[in-house]
């Protein structure tokens, strides 16, 4: 009887949801709740340095927006900055026009303008808002949303919102530029680099060679150095007003730009009661992984004799932050150890796991997703759900099937807050009595050596209190998205194709879209779908949870599915901001007419943001030579300028254009200029050059070229970090003249020229190094390398 009640209620809710998406405005005369958010640039100090940030109503994070289910939200967003901005309401079901993705669904908010967002509140739970313009979220444009249900289903006395974030004192665009140039500085700065001396000490040379063979420096699981991780804008924050015995609903949101966290609690183990705004069957769980953009609610009991420490630990162990609930002595949270990156490399080597799938493949229009999946990564099903294991993966050609007349009634998204008859109190108490050690254990852990490497990153502990599955008769469209990336050039994509080189993923209303997310990288990827909740298929089958964001662990896979009940275009992307801005995104489209209010705001502007040019340079100022290198690069195109001047007055310069065919191979052409006599600038020789540049296995940079005098040249270079901050490098070049154009000396069949150098470098900072080298042209010397 209860199941029939919930099914009928679900049908009613979704029918209303579809209608409300088409008809905007407060047509039902709901009570109005109104806010004004003002975004401006201000000087802030979050990590010991005063820098420019972006505030919402004068603070970072912005204010908590509170609503009650059944209200009508009107939010005025005022832009007092000199650049455009936007606000996305993360996890909120609302009309497409107000979703807040500039140039896709919503106009950008230009400097000095105010945009009014308005939508009915049809759900309850913990959510958040943030800018969707470039990297503004990293600078501070984010805040939380709390929506109270019409009738509470949980028992607690008070509540607390904890917004997690990461903070950099650099300009976010400079951070991305540093990543694009392939710098290892962030790994060095936070102590997570794996130089050769540590690899040798651990007996992991074979594992390191295996990574190098696959063109990977190491098991990098986080990109960026952060001087501070924050909870509600502070590295440590106290909440002493909670009294002993009180039950507190702690609403946690990971609003970080690129950091997922492990969460641990001191005192009595908490009860996890909600995920991404949806109630789940309460489970006692202390150590919990929260991916970027996810939200989890816990019920914690304030102890009689102390205060609870809530601690977050960055996924790579590079930092922590704490909040304290209550007063008295500290009940410390368990410490999460730093990941063993060298140990990870060793385990993966034993598994003979193939990595290095292209982030930028040769033919972006060719469908090779199954080939990619079969060739790279973990060749096994990591899911615990038998239904997932039985899925047929051979019919993914996006066939269109007839929609059964009654399937629309059963294939809809759930609004958990409407289920007022659901009695969670008893389940909550039962969970409190459960044994936390058993609840936290990893079920079904693989016994083969190395196979448990990422087994703790799963959602099996999340179970919906009601069935979430769709009608068995509903047509299903299956999509495979391999998550691919390249750390050297910092390009992130799906199926080897970044956003700028792909078309929209078209879906239809009235069908189930099932997406398998197959991660072929060493990074976590929290994937967020705008405007929808999807089922995360886990061991709970029909009771799999509903979420708006799902974390896909390194070399693992997750399957999600959702019922098509919306209209318009919706963004689907990795919520690591720097990955999204580097191409790991798609547009999910119902292929409906574009809103006329978006005229003048082409979606090409959004796409272009992921294919920008980034430029950088370096100057070597040494006693025996001086060199300059300048680079400007986007996804496929790169321009290079280099000049070198030796102590013997040998001057050489070169300008080239490169076209990347895929991650590791590019063709190039350009002009080389060199003074004909080493000690004279009277005459210069100019030659045209064409060739290929290739990143070989084991990370050697190969340059093979020929000039307009038909003289071939080959060059090979490599750098290796031996100790933290300390690297060795070498370069070899061989040029041959067979006399095809030039006259050779008497009795010579050919002439050749060899250039080689070797040296060491010590990094003082991100931008300055001291170096010493020997060059067979210039001799030995030393000096500074300055990067900009």
Q: Where are the model-predicted features located?
A:
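Outer-membrane beta-barrel strand-turn architecture
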Residues: 633-636, 647, 659-665, 675, ...
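Solvent-exposed loop/turn segments connecting transmembrane beta-strands
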Residues: 618-627, 643-653, 673-686, 696, ...
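Intrinsic, low-complexity N-terminal interaction/targeting segments
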Residues: 271-272, 277, 494, 503-504, ...
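Repeated loop/turn-to-beta-strand initiation elements of outer-membrane beta-barrel proteins
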Residues: 127, 570, 626, 635-640, ...
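Transmembrane beta-strand segments of Gram-negative outer membrane beta-barrel proteins
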Residues: 35-36, 481, 605-626, 634-643, ...
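Bacterial Sec-dependent N-terminal signal peptides
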Residues: 1-22
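Outer-membrane beta-barrel "beta-signal"
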Residues: 690, 757-761, 777-788
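Histidine-centered copper-binding motifs that mark active-site loops
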Residues: 21-292, 298-299, 329-363, 373, ...
């Amino acid at each position: 009887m209860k199941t029939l009640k919930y099914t009928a209620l679900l049908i009613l809710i979704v029918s209303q949801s579809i209608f409300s998406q088409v008809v905007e405005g407060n047509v039902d005369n709901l009570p109005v709740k109104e806010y004004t958010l003002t975004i401006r640039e201000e000087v802030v100090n979050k990590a010991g340095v005063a820098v420019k940030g972006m505030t919402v109503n004068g603070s970072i994070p912005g204010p908590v927006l509170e609503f009650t289910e059944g209200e009508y939200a009107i939010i005025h967003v005022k832009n007092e900055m000199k650049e455009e901005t936007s606000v996305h309401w993360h996890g909120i079901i609302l009309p497409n026009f107000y979703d807040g993705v500039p140039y896709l669904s919503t106009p950008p908010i230009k400097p000095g303008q105010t945009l009014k967002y308005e939508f009915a509140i049809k759900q309850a739970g913990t959510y958040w808002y943030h800018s969707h313009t470039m990297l503004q979220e990293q600078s501070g444009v984010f805040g939380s949303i709390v929506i109270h249900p019409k009738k509470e289903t949980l028992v607690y006395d008070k509540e607390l919102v904890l917004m997690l974030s990461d903070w950099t004192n650099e300009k976010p665009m400079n951070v991305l530029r540093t990543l694009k140039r392939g710098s290892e500085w962030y790994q060095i700065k936070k102590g997570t680099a794996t130089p050769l001396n540590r690899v040798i000490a651990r007996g992991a040379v074979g594992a390191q060679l295996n990574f190098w063979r696959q063109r990977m420096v190491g098991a990098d699981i986080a990109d960026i150095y952060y001087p501070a991780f924050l909870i509600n804008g502070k590295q440590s924050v106290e909440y002493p007003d909670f009294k002993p015995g009180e039950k507190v609903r702690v609403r946690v949101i990971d609003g970080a730009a690129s950091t997922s966290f492990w969460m641990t609690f001191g005192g009595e183990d908490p009860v996890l009661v909600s995920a991404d705004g949806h109630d789940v069957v309460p489970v006692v769980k202390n150590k919990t992984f929260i991916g970027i953009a996810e939200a989890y609610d816990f019920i914690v009991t304030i102890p009689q004799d102390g205060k609870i420490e809530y601690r977050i630990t960055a996924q790579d162990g590079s930092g922590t932050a704490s909040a304290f609930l209550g007063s008295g002595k500290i009940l410390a949270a368990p410490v999460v150890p730093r990941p063993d990156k060298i140990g990870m490399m060793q385990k993966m080597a034993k598994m003979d796991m193939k990595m290095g799938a292209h982030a930028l493949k040769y033919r972006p229009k060719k469908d090779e997703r199954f080939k990619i999946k079969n060739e790279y990564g973990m060749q096994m099903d990591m899911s615990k759900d038998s239904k997932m294991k039985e899925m047929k993966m051979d019919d993914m050609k996006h066939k269109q099937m007839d929609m059964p007349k009654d399937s629309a009634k059963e294939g809809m998204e759930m609004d958990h807050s409407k289920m007022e008859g659901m009695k969670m109190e008893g389940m909550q108490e039962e969970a409190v009595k459960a044994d936390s050690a058993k609840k936290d254990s990893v079920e079904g852990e693989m016994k083969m050596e190395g196979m448990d490497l990422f087994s703790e990153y799963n959602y099996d502990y999340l179970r919906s209190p009601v069935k979430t599955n769709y009608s068995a008769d509903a047509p299903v469209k299956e999509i495979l998205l391999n998550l691919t990336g390249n750390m050297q050039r910092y390009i992130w994509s799906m199926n080897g194709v970044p956003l700028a080189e792909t078309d929209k993923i078209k879906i239809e209303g009235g069908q189930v879209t099932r997406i398998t997310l197959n991660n072929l990288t060493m990074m976590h990827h929290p994937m967020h779908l705008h405007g929808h909740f999807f089922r995360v298929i886990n061991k709970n089958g029909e009771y799999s949870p509903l979420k708006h964001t799902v974390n896909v662990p390194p070399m693992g896979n997750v399957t999600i599915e959702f019922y098509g009940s919306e209209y318009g275009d919706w963004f689907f992307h990795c919520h690591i901001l720097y990955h999204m801005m580097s191409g790991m995104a798609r547009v999910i489209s119902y292929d409906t007419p574009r809103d006329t209010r978006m005229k003048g705001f082409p979606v090409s502007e959004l796409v272009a943001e992921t294919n920008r040019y980034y430029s950088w340079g370096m100057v070597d100022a040494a006693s025996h030579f001086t060199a300059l290198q300048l680079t400007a690069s986007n996804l496929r195109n790169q321009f290079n300028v280099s000049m070198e001047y030796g102590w013997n007055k040998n001057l050489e310069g070169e300008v080239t254009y490169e076209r990347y065919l895929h991650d590791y191979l590019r063709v190039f052409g350009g002009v080389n200029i060199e003074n004909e006599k080493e000690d004279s600038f009277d005459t210069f020789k100019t030659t045209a050059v064409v060739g290929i540049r290739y990143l070989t296995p084991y990370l050697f940079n190969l340059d093979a070229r020929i000039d307009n005098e038909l003289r071939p040249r080959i060059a090979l270079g490599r750098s290796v970090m031996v100790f933290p901050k300390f690297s060795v490098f070498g370069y070899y070049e061989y040029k041959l003249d067979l006399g095809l154009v030039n006259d050779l000396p008497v009795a010579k069949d050919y002439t050749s020229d060899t250039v080689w150098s070797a040296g060491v470098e010590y990094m003082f900072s991100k931008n300055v190094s001291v170096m010493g080298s020997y060059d067979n042209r210039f001799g030995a010397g030393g000096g500074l390398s300055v990067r900009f």
